[in-house]
């Protein structure tokens, strides 16, 4: 079986990044990559044409098409297709924010939404949490906190910088997700959710390897599903996304007061400028920022 799709240059590079984890084959003339993934061979050409061949060619190609549940803009892969009617299940969902921001914490939240609470959560209007303004999320978060079982892991910069030499950012994410999920499971016990949905940032096997390598005593693994854009598939992830964002914003506000200057979110030029100003004032960045980011060196060069 053969399937061919056409992608833009950015998507082609993303695909090359994703497939770099698989066994490579001899790259044909005019191609950027050629790999074997399960029962499919995938070859991406500089022209933007990507050819899928083999028994699972159609399924592999579907991961990269807009109408697919799979979203692999980064090297991520769903463990399995979500079950039918998943949106109406009782689900414990988790999400994190702050991994790509220089200033502030890495914040992870987990929220349990039972079937009987689904309508209440829908009424909050959070189905697409990524489109909500910060002010709107700040109004919704207290209601989620008061009504739904939840837990938040807020890894502030100083602790983050202590852990970073030992764990890469994805491993820190995995540890935080696992810990938050475990805490919520303890809170709702003896109730067991029908499923756990993690907003995906790593391949399933890689996620669990992160936890094993970190020697986590308790690893949550039963009925766990992974998908990117998880907030689109269950309200529990949308609720978790909102909690994580609001806690991050609160932490950023407090850090800004301590620093005596508004700390911007993100990792752009404004961040470099503010970091340089803190250095001029003799302020230690480790309390405010994730030091391994390239922004640290950029700020130093601005002095």
Curated annotation (Swiss-Prot):
Names of required cofactors: Mn(2+); Mg(2+)
One cellular-component annotation, GO: cytoplasm
Domain RNase H type-2: start-end pairs: 89-303
A Gene Ontology biological process term: DNA replication, removal of RNA primer
Regions annotated as coiled coil: none
Keyword Oxidoreductase applies: no
Cofactor note: Manganese or magnesium. Binds 1 divalent metal ion per monomer in the absence of substrate. May bind a second metal ion after substrate binding.
Annotated GO MF terms: magnesium ion binding; RNA binding; RNA-DNA hybrid ribonuclease activity
Pfam family, one: DUF3378
Residues noted as binding a divalent metal cation in the record, renumbered to the chain: 95-96, 199
Keywords noted in UniProt: Cytoplasm, Endonuclease, Hydrolase, Magnesium, Metal-binding, Nuclease
Reactions catalysed: Endonucleolytic cleavage to 5'-phosphomonoester
EC numbers on record: 3.1.26.4
Location in or out of the cell: Cytoplasm
Main location as per UniProt: cytoplasm
InterPro entries per the UniProt record, alphabetical: RNase_HII/HIII, RNase_HII/HIII_dom, RNase_HIII, RNase_HIII_N, RNaseH-like_sf, RNaseH_sf, TBP_dom_sf
Family under the similarity heading: Belongs to the RNase HII family. RnhC subfamily.
Described purpose of this protein according to its UniProt entry: Endonuclease that specifically degrades the RNA of RNA-DNA hybrids.
Protein name: Ribonuclease HIII
Organism this protein belongs to: Leuconostoc mesenteroides subsp. mesenteroides (strain ATCC 8293 / DSM 20343 / BCRC 11652 / CCM 1803 / JCM 6124 / NCDO 523 / NBRC 100496 / NCIMB 8023 / NCTC 12954 / NRRL B-1118 / 37Y)
């Amino acid at each position: 079986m053969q399937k061919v799709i056409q992608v833009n240059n950015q998507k082609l590079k993303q695909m090359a990044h994703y497939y770099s984890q698989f066994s490579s084959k001899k790259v044909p003339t005019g191609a950027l990559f050629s790999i074997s993934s399960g029962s499919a061979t995938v070859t991406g050409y500089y022209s933007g044409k990507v050819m899928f061949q083999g028994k699972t060619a159609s399924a592999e190609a579907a991961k990269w098409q807009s109408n697919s549940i799979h979203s692999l803009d980064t090297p991520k892969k769903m463990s399995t297709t979500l079950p039918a009617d998943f949106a109406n299940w009782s689900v414990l969902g988790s999400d994190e924010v702050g991994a790509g921001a220089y200033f502030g914490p890495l914040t992870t939240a987990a929220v349990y939404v039972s079937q009987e609470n689904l309508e209440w959560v829908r009424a909050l209007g959070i189905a697409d949490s990524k489109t909500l303004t910060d002010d709107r999320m700040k109004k919704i978060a207290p209601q989620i906190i008061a009504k739904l079982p939840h837990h938040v892991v807020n890894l502030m910069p100083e602790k983050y910088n202590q852990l970073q030499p030992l764990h890469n950012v994805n491993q820190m994410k995995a540890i935080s997700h696992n810990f938050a999920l475990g805490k919520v499971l303890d809170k709702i016990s003896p109730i067991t959710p029908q499923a756990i949905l993690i907003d995906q940032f790593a391949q399933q096997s890689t996620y669990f390897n992160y936890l094993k390598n970190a020697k986590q005593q308790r690893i949550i693994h039963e009925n766990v599903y992974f998908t990117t854009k998880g907030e689109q598939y269950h309200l529990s992830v949308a609720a978790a996304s909102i909690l994580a964002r609001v806690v991050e914003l609160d932490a950023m506000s407090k850090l800004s007061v301590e620093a005596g200057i508004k700390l911007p979110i993100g990792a752009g030029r404004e961040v470099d400028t503010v970091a340089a100003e803190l250095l001029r004032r003799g302020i230690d960045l480790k309390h405010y920022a994730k030091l391994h980011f390239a922004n640290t060196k950029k700020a130093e060069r601005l002095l």
